[in-house]
Amino acid sequence: MSAERRVSREQARRIAIAAQGFLDPRPAPFGATMRHLQRVIDRVGVVQIDSVNVLVRSQYLPFFSRLGPYDLALLDRARDRAPRRLVEYWAHEASLIPPATWPLLDFRMREAAEKAWGSMRRILAERPEFVELVQREVEQRGPLTASEVEQALEHDQPRPTDHWGWNWSEVKRALEFLFWAGRISSAGRTAQFERRYAALDVPPPPDQRAAWLDRPGPEADPDRFLELVRIAARAHGVGSERCLADYFRLKREQVRPAIERLVADGELIPVTVPGWRRAWLHAEARIPRRVHAEALLSPFDSLVWQRERVHTLWDFHYRIEIYTPKHKRVHGYYVLPFLYGDRLVARCDLKADRQRGLLRCHAVTWEPDAPAGAPAALRRQLDAMAAWLRLEPGPVPDGRPIGNGSRAAAELSGILDDRGAEGHRTAEQSQGARALVGETDGRLA
């Protein structure tokens, strides 16, 4: 038996960056078309949603990171208008996925009665007739927001003064259960980020409606897992079993047979990568000799959302501190990793100060030995982000280094003075997902 091919950590980083679309040509600023957006969708396969809006809602950022400044309405159109290129479901976390991927998650829909959050399970157990009523309202009158469903129920069956047992919280719980269970879907969002619930025949393109409406049972799950692992493997380029499982939150026992089938078919190649016990390379993955990339990354970008992978490939310790008390935060509230070349070289705590029209950078923390060219690249990306968000670029503080310091931190002060510078679900992800279900008020109930 021949020895497995060895892939260095540096090669693995470059493979991952290329697979995620960071080396594809960028259009001119604000020149991106739906074709460019589709290219990113095809590359990553999943875009995580998050309701935090301190900078911009997270689902918009992966497209900026790969395309540069683009019209945000382009993504809204891909999600909200037929033929939809993106629909919502629980994929990695709450996510935007291609309509063709939605039926592959049927196994998760069937688990809703047992695995949905407690308040959703309770509404099904205690008020099954009410859940059916809410489903009928959506199917007959949708797409509808939660508040519109409430208004429709109020019109059809007005509540007496002593109430007859339902309220907005129950409507929302019923809708979220039905959404999780795949009994209804989403036709997009309002400008206030409220989900527009819809019958299952509304979101998919005509050629995919049958796959949505007539889903095979558990006997088709092995093929579903195969397709999901195939998407993850292509999007990662190279990865461990945990990487491939985490992309769609699959279990190891669901992933292993799929990996074996893909290896047997020649789509995956077993390789040795330092830091992973076992790893697989996608047969069509590019292995660039060098990488010229500059990108500020969403905390929920698919390049960095699996923290063990980030630590293994980049030796970069990254945690989201949104839900960390202020006095315990290390790097800031909304911190974006900065990709330069094939390395993650800095963390930037950013905020869109819409009242003053400024993109604020509260802090920059540089990795040890960050390259000397990184500060100028960061300044370029901050300027591009400010233009994208229709803000002025605000002052940037001198970066503070980690450990023994960095050439980048030493260089940063001079550059900015010229500009007038002044895998498994973590607790942080669960909190974010629960806040997302609450939509605009950040609460489920």
Regions of interest found by a model, annotated:
Residues M1-L297, D301-R309, F316-I320, P325-V335, ...:
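Long, low-complexity intrinsically disordered regions
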